[in-house]
Amino acid sequence: MKKVEIKKKTIKELNIELMNLLREQFNLTLQHSAKKLQQSHLLQHVRRNIAQVNTILAEKEKECD
């Protein structure tokens, strides 16, 4: 997901996106531990997306205060 797309979302949408990414990370981690994950780079992409969403979310919450 691109930063431009993330910045356009509202705080509520970002929280929903964050929950979806955390769920996806959990599922990928389980697959990785069971040695069923063929594309291990997906785990890194999800982690990066979580960090981006958290950063933008913190910026937006700081703007509101």
From Swiss-Prot:
<dbReference type="GO" id="GO:0006412">
    <property type="term" value="P:translation"/>
</dbReference>
<dbReference type="GO" id="GO:0003735">
    <property type="term" value="F:structural constituent of ribosome"/>
</dbReference>
<comment type="similarity">
    <text>Belongs to the universal ribosomal protein uL29 family.</text>
</comment>
<dbReference type="InterPro" id="IPR050063">
    <property type="entry name" value="Ribosomal_protein_uL29"/>
</dbReference>
<keyword id="KW-0689">Ribosomal protein</keyword>
<dbReference type="GO" id="GO:0022625">
    <property type="term" value="C:cytosolic large ribosomal subunit"/>
</dbReference>
<protein>
    <recommendedName>
        <fullName>Large ribosomal subunit protein uL29</fullName>
    </recommendedName>
</protein>
<keyword id="KW-0687">Ribonucleoprotein</keyword>
<dbReference type="Pfam" id="PF00831">
    <property type="entry name" value="Ribosomal_L29"/>
</dbReference>
<dbReference type="InterPro" id="IPR001854">
    <property type="entry name" value="Ribosomal_uL29"/>
</dbReference>
<dbReference type="InterPro" id="IPR036049">
    <property type="entry name" value="Ribosomal_uL29_sf"/>
</dbReference>
